[in-house]
UniProtKB/Swiss-Prot annotation:
<feature type="region of interest" description="Disordered">
    <location>
        <begin position="415"/>
        <end position="452"/>
    </location>
</feature>
<keyword id="KW-0832">Ubl conjugation</keyword>
<feature type="compositionally biased region" description="Low complexity">
    <location>
        <begin position="434"/>
        <end position="452"/>
    </location>
</feature>
<dbReference type="InterPro" id="IPR050200">
    <property type="entry name" value="Nuclear_hormone_rcpt_NR3"/>
</dbReference>
<dbReference type="GO" id="GO:0005654">
    <property type="term" value="C:nucleoplasm"/>
</dbReference>
<dbReference type="GO" id="GO:0034056">
    <property type="term" value="F:estrogen response element binding"/>
</dbReference>
<keyword id="KW-0963">Cytoplasm</keyword>
<feature type="short sequence motif" description="Nuclear localization signal">
    <location>
        <begin position="183"/>
        <end position="187"/>
    </location>
</feature>
<keyword id="KW-0238">DNA-binding</keyword>
<feature type="compositionally biased region" description="Low complexity">
    <location>
        <begin position="335"/>
        <end position="356"/>
    </location>
</feature>
<comment type="function">
    <text>The steroid hormones and their receptors are involved in the regulation of eukaryotic gene expression and affect cellular proliferation and differentiation in target tissues. Transcriptional activator of several progesteron-dependent promoters in a variety of cell types. Involved in activation of SRC-dependent MAPK signaling on hormone stimulation.</text>
</comment>
<comment type="similarity">
    <text>Belongs to the nuclear hormone receptor family.</text>
</comment>
<feature type="modified residue" description="Phosphoserine; by MAPK">
    <location>
        <position position="345"/>
    </location>
</feature>
<feature type="modified residue" description="Phosphoserine; by CDK2">
    <location>
        <position position="400"/>
    </location>
</feature>
<dbReference type="InterPro" id="IPR035500">
    <property type="entry name" value="NHR-like_dom_sf"/>
</dbReference>
<dbReference type="GO" id="GO:0030518">
    <property type="term" value="P:nuclear receptor-mediated steroid hormone signaling pathway"/>
</dbReference>
<feature type="region of interest" description="Mediates transcriptional transrepression">
    <location>
        <begin position="165"/>
        <end position="305"/>
    </location>
</feature>
Amino acid sequence: MTELKAKGPRAPHVAGGPPSPEVGSPLLCRPAAGPFPGSQTSDTLPEVSAIPISLDGLLFPRPCQGQDPSNEKTQDQQSLSDVEGAYSRAEATRGAGGSSSSPPEKDSGLLDSVLDTLLAPSGPGQSQPSPPACEVTSSWCLFGPELPEDPPAAPATQGVLSPLMSRSGCKAGDSSGTAAAHKVLPRGLSPSRQLLLPASGSPHWSGAPVKPSPQPAAVEVEEEDGSESEESAGPLLKGKPRALGGAAAGGGAAAVPPGAAAGGVALVPKEDSRFSAPRVALVEQDAPMAPXRSPLATTMMDFIHVPILPLNHALLAARTRQLLEDESYDGGAGAXSAFAPPRSSPSASSTPVAVGDFPDCAYPPDAEPKDDAYPLYSDFQPPALKIKEEEEGAEASARSPRSYLVAGANPAAFPDFPLGPPPPLPPRAPPSRPGEAAVTAAPASASVSSASSSGSTLECILYKAEGAPPQQGPFAPPPCKAPGASGCLLPRDGLPSTSASAAAAGAAPALYPALGLNGLPQLGYQAAVLKEGLPQVYPPYLNYLRPDSEASQSPQYSFESLPQKICLICGDEASGCHYGVLTCGSCKVFFKRAMEGQHNYLCAGRNDCIVDKIRRKNCPACRLRKCCQAGMVLGGRKFKKFNKVRVVRALDAVALPQPVGIPNESQALSQRFTFSPGQDIQLIPPLINLLMSIEPDVIYAGHDNTKPDTSSSLLTSLNQLGERQLLSVVKWSKSLPGFRNLHIDDQITLIQYSWMSLMVFGLGWRSYKHVSGQMLYFAPDLILNEQRMKESSFYSLCLTMWQIPQEFVKLQVSQEEFLCMKVLLLLNTIPLEGLRSQTQFEEMRSSYIRELIKAIGLRQKGVVSSSQRFYQLTKLLDNLHDLVKQLHLYCLNTFIQSRALSVEFPEMMSEVIAAQLPKILAGMVKPLLFHKK
């Protein structure tokens, strides 16, 4: 086989022949040095360097250095019969060619005539210099994979129409009519997916000006005959500068791509022997059809069409998507992409670009390449949706990062994964072609950029334990991940790796587009967790997710299973903590009615009746006894209301022995609320004796009983007594266990808020203890009987204070109970904003409530009576708030009218009244109540 060579610009012209083609025509075999250094090709292995798809090569032709483009003569249009004859003679010449370096002169002249006829400018009188052959650039393959080129000894004489001529059984006149239209179809395009043929005389690109079509430099795309040529891509397109020779016969025509008309490169795919239909040049003439030319001369397929327009990134991506969809959706043929990096890239002239990389011109100006997002199946996801590929093991670090899809680009442009039928599909087998393995082993420097493998921040919800942790980066996952986890709990749309080792190991099956968890129905959102799917993807936490039936069988408290809430009285399902004990609603109501109604229940048996869910109503006496044994007290509800106050156990080991029938849960709860002696407040059994020892001495009022009582003298004597008692309260509080642990400001505040309550409560105790509640015993020298009360100006107030000793008489309050209640009165009112030592205050108050329970148990031997007594005493403490409020109001009015009433107020008492009483009366304090009103 011989190659057609063009004449030099100054070679002798054939007599009577057509004009010689100019320098740089497609008939030249070896192109001269072009404007791009490093893009020289060789005869045997023409390796073309990658240059960008820029405007310099496609739109603006650049002549070779040192070449003067000659003017091309315009020839008249010849008839179709002349073209067919020339094509037949050219085919005969090629078939008879031997080792001669040039064809016969006659045939060469006829071939030149045919080429000058078909490739002439569209209009007469128009001339344009042809692009030099040295501007052979890297091919831009968008419609099929390619493999390393054939051995150098393979014949390289095929031109644009060589597939038509070399096909077995094909004659010069066979390609006519409709058959020719099917023969020019590309390999991956079926007749049902044909593009609409453009109308005659109309350009295929709207808005594109009609320009002359100079002769382009053709680059033949060679492909290897293999079974996987349509499923995977080779490392790089290898293009050879070929002669664009031959003319169409019987309707076939040589066409010029629009990109070549502006100085680009025409892609001439090599013949593939596997298919009966030949592969022709995927090029097209952009000029209108000449009047004397065959209709098929301008009806080549509009397959790879680069418009002669100033291309922007969006237009290029949109056109690429259109071209790729036309081929990749037909028959499942794979699509190959071999974009070149920009010219400014350091590797633009020598380093091959890995298959699947976009050029920088395909990105927005400020966009950073990110991880790839390839869908495995034909239903492509939105381009803006980023689904990070799962990294499987240490092999993932060897993978070269790939570019992220830009808006408008079809994911089918990436050849790494085959387009197959809908899911489910098995993982792809390891690649068997050396070209594909070379792509996976390409260094990261050949890629556009190194994308970080850190996942979205939108994917750190549920992670699975398998896989290596992702690398730390600017978008590293937060530290809330489980140890050793690298992906979400729900498998994302993972894709098989392109490396052989990762593909052999097998990747997680992709779940896109039908999201499902291990074959379960589709989830509504990715954060959903199905317990049935956890054994496959989330094994580390399965030990803590136990069925409810198993959890209820374990009576012990553990991390794995929380105890079921059951009533400690009857065993029914508990509704909450009522009166300090975990009980059901029925036992709660029963205990409240039994305690407030003061019923005297009697057991018909031996006080050992069974109380359960079925028989809890049989014996109310045993049910109430069990409630009290469990620790239910009416005051426990109030303790929970005030911030962090511990629930009080009505029966303690000191007051009552531990019952035998209390369940383990009740014992555990009782131990939780037992005060530890190792804390700051040392509450020991002789505490009541300590309270007795620090009780103040007898305080005298200094009233002169020899003189008749007047309103001013009596009130003045009471104020003097109040001043002395206030000093006594300060001294007593300093000796009170636990009070010095509070902040100094809290100590002063508590004394100022409670001094009136302590004074009137002491008055009631003295009246009850000394005169059995018949008179008001203010001091040994100031005792008011009922007659003196009536003569005083505050008789109504005396009747109010007289209620306290009468209650003591009614309840028969013991000294131990009084001492504990007195301490609780000191801790009975706090500011609205709380105290500085609020925690210590609550601990102290809870401790003295327990001491009151112990004091009650010293005299009350019955459990029921003890609980009722506690309720009555705490109810008395709550009633003191209203009584003391009346005293505050009278004291403040007297203080304001002290000069008019001639009543003297001591200095310290005056300061307390002026500073705190207005605040107390305005409701700016918080009384701590045991019971609701």
